[in-house]
């Protein structure tokens, strides 16, 4: 853990540390990788306060992984990490393993959500999974964030190069009535009379 402080440019959340496991400094962690034990394949993990963590050992246990980090040698040191989120730089994720229609959730943040008429419904500010399917958080200028389902019905197309998502506002729950679509223009200011 005595690595130099690291400031990440484009951090991607990889794991959240839970409680201590045993007396040797091991911790339980929730890994956000397809294969939880692959967490060790990404090199050093970093906290947002700049600390760097090297995984020495990792094993699966029920719904978590048990991890031993260099420099964390006793239960007290392990307990001090409870709740800490660990990140890697986005550039460290392997793009060559992705199919043409695959992407990382981190790549969705910042995309503008538009309908087929070009009306903007906001920018993606987060991707969440609360257990009933993935949700995208959209936030427009001066508006409260809204969550829409991240499904084929709601999100029709993702264009990372153009920085846009094509959405169906009706399927996404942003409008209740198809007739409202012609009236709804959230990205255009109202005209003064």
Curated annotation (Swiss-Prot):
Domain PRC barrel: 100-173
Main localization of the protein described in the UniProt heading: cytoplasm
Location(s) in or outside the cell: Cytoplasm
An individual GO BP term: ribosomal small subunit biogenesis
Stretches of the chain forming a coiled coil according to its record: none
Any single Gene Ontology cellular-component annotation: ribosome
Keywords, sorted A to Z: Chaperone, Cytoplasm, Ribosome biogenesis, rRNA processing
Example GO molecular function: ribosome binding
NCBIfam families found in the cross-reference section: 16S_RimM (TIGR02273)
HAMAP family: Ribosome_mat_RimM (MF_00014)
Family classification: Belongs to the RimM family.
Role description: An accessory protein needed during the final step in the assembly of 30S ribosomal subunit, possibly for assembly of the head region. Essential for efficient processing of 16S rRNA. May be needed both before and after RbfA during the maturation of 16S rRNA. It has affinity for free ribosomal 30S subunits but not for 70S ribosomes.
Domain comment quoted from the record: The PRC barrel domain binds ribosomal protein uS19.
Self-association state and partner proteins as the record states: Binds ribosomal protein uS19.
Protein name in the entry: Ribosome maturation factor RimM
Upper classification of the organism: Bacteria, Pseudomonadati, Pseudomonadota, Alphaproteobacteria, Hyphomicrobiales
Gene: rimM
């Amino acid at each position: 853990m005595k690595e130099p402080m690291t400031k990440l440019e484009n951090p991607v959340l990889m794991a959240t540390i839970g409680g201590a496991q045993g007396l040797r400094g091991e911790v339980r962690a929730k890994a956000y990788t397809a294969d939880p034990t692959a967490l060790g394949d990404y090199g050093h993990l970093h906290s947002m306060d700049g600390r760097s963590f090297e995984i020495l050992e990792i094993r699966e246990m029920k719904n978590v992984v048990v991890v031993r980090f260099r420099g964390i040698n006793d239960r007290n040191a392990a307990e001090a990490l409870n709740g800490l989120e660990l990140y890697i730089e986005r550039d460290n994720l392997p793009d060559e393993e992705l199919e043409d229609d695959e992407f990382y959730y981190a790549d969705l943040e910042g995309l503008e959500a538009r309908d087929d008429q070009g009306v903007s419904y906001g920018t993606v500010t987060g991707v969440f999974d609360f257990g009933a399917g993935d949700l995208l958080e959209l936030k427009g200028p001066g508006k409260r964030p809204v969550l829409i389902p991240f499904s084929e019905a709601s999100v029709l197309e993702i264009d990372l190069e153009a920085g846009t998502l094509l959405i169906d506002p009706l399927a996404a729950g942003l409008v209740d009535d198809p007739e409202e679509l012609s009236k709804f223009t959230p990205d255009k200011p109202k005209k003064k009379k």
